[in-house]
Amino acid sequence: LNDLLMNLKGMAPLGIPVNKIGGQARNLPRLIDEAFHSDNHMLVFPAGLCSRKIDGKIQDLPWGKAFISKSRQTGRDIIPIHFEGENSKRFYNIASLQKLLGLKFNFAMLLLPDEMYRSTGRKYKVTFGKPVSIASLDKSKSDFEWAQQIRNSVYEL
C-alpha cells in the first residue's frame, strides 16, 4: 500500500508500506520476503500504480516481473484476479494531465483515499482465474514475458 493509504485507519495491518513519495524504508525487502514466505494470501499490484485511462479504456500500466521472480524464489503459485471497477473521472483526468505535462510526481495518488471512501457501499465484480503453478512457468520465457502473459489472461477473465 502506498504511504497515503497506510495512514488510513485500519489499513496499516493489511499491507506492506511502499513509499511512492520519498525513499523506501530499509526493511522493505525484508517485509516483502517475509510476506512471500508466509502462508498468508496476498494481493500484488504488478503495475505498481492504479490503472489509468489509456485510449479511452481503463487498464493497467505495464506489469513488472517482481511477482513472478519472488513467486519463483519462494515456490508460491499465482492466482490471477480481475477486479472490475474504476475511479472517478477526476482521478483519470488528473493522471492524464500529469502525464501530458510531464510531471514526475503522482498527483492522482493524492486522491486515492478520497476515491476509496467515495466507493463505500458500491458493488464490484471480482473474478478469480485458474491457479498458475509456479513450476509451469519454465525458462522458455523470461519472468517479464510470463508477467505479460498472466496480465493478458487477467484481462480475459
Over which residues does each language-model region extend?
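Non-catalytic C-terminal accessory region of glycerolipid acyltransferases
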Residues: 26-157
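Catalytic core of membrane glycerolipid acyltransferases/transacylases, capturing the structured
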Residues: 1-23
